[in-house]
Amino acid sequence: YIKAGEPRWRATAHMIADLAGGPILVPATFPLALARELESFRPVLLDAAGAVEGMRAVKTPEEIERIRSVQRVTEAAMERGIALIRTSVPRGGVLHRDGRPLTSEAVRAEMHAYLLAHGCRGTDTIVSCGPDTALPHSPGIGPLREDEPIVIDIYPQDDLSGYHADMTRTVVKGEPTPAIREMYDAVRDAKARGARRRKRRHRRARALLPRDRRCPPGGYGCGDTDRL
């Protein structure tokens, strides 16, 4: 039994060892502290050949349906957030709803409330505006502005299945600048190009990116592509 007051790593290792019932195979990226604690319960083997990663990469039909389920909730939550922006009224360059400025926090709270009501949790949700959108993981703070790009990125997890979805959208209330339109078009075209050339394994998608990590033809940096 797990004892009250056990350190976090040891309690986690204790639980895993009980469930495993025998030797445990771990990937090279497995937390060292947890591996050390596991060794006090079960033999721990390093998966140098990448067998665990290969097993996780191929999803069963049941897993795919769980991912689709959380994705459907994610899409609906995203639409709730975008609807707040769509129905806002610009005043002096700032978006307003119900007589007060519409903020990143308000949009984030609306989406999180929907996610919670449908069995999911949102963490590290991004609702950034204007110059903040140049920072890849800026959460966003304060009033949203007219004619400025608003980046919304949500990464919910289903409370029961543990599976995640991930969705990002860029919207503008008003008229985007030519530079913003150009960047938007470059991303759209790059996505379409990648979809046409996609392969079964995700590592091949990464190989489609140029070695200098520039995304033709717009000449913009690709940003975070490590999770392709």
Please tell me what each predicted stretch does.
Residues Y1-L228:
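Active-site neighborhoods and metal-handling regions in enzymes and metal-associated proteins
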